[in-house]
Amino acid sequence: EYDHGYDVGYGPLTDHVFHPTDQGGLIIETGMPNSGKTDFLNDLTCRLMAKTGRYVCYLSFEVPDKDKHIAHLVQLMLGKVNTVNYTQEQLKPIVSFLNSHMVHLDLHEVSPTPDNIIARADIVRRSLPLKYLIIDPYLFMEVETNRYNTETQAIKAMLTQMQTWGRIHNIWVIIVAHPRSLKKQNGKNELENIDMYTISGSANWANLADFIFSISRIKRQDGNYTRLDMLKVRDQD
């Protein structure tokens, strides 16, 4: 029987996001700087933990402090920006749940190479039923480039390594990747649209990923909102 995946916690909106299975693989999130990519992933993974009980590991260069990260996720779980009116007793079970379901990947003294990230994530995987590894953003990863190994080749090797590890262990690896410098559209004072081929460094982002989506902030006079565009879905009905 075909596995149509599970609800990521957005209710009816899930149909417009995606239905991941427990197969694992590679998901890429892209978007302009300050477009809300980290905020969306925090919200998504918060819902995944709360609604499905899945375990998430973060390698977050954006929010490296786990306590600050938990404080933000508590706000998301409560739907309140200000939690000052909640007592410690009220907050304790939420903090305890998050503390047990989310892990911050601590690289300590080692550089953030694909090998080191996977080695540390393997330690987490052996102690918890890990389902998601978040790398936010790719910009801070170190991939080896030299005269014999171009950036395109290095990115392809990194993506293949992450995807293979994810599929072997049924873990979704989500990598946040910025677009290259976008060109202005002819005759318009607007930048070209982001798609899966505008991700910086290599077309292999588009070629190898199982899912790709972009996040953008839309500002209008009648209100602001966040927009998600699903750019690639592999083998899903």
Task: List each language-model region with its residue ranges.
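Conserved inter-motif catalytic segment of the P-loop NTP-binding fold
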Residues: 52-149, 157
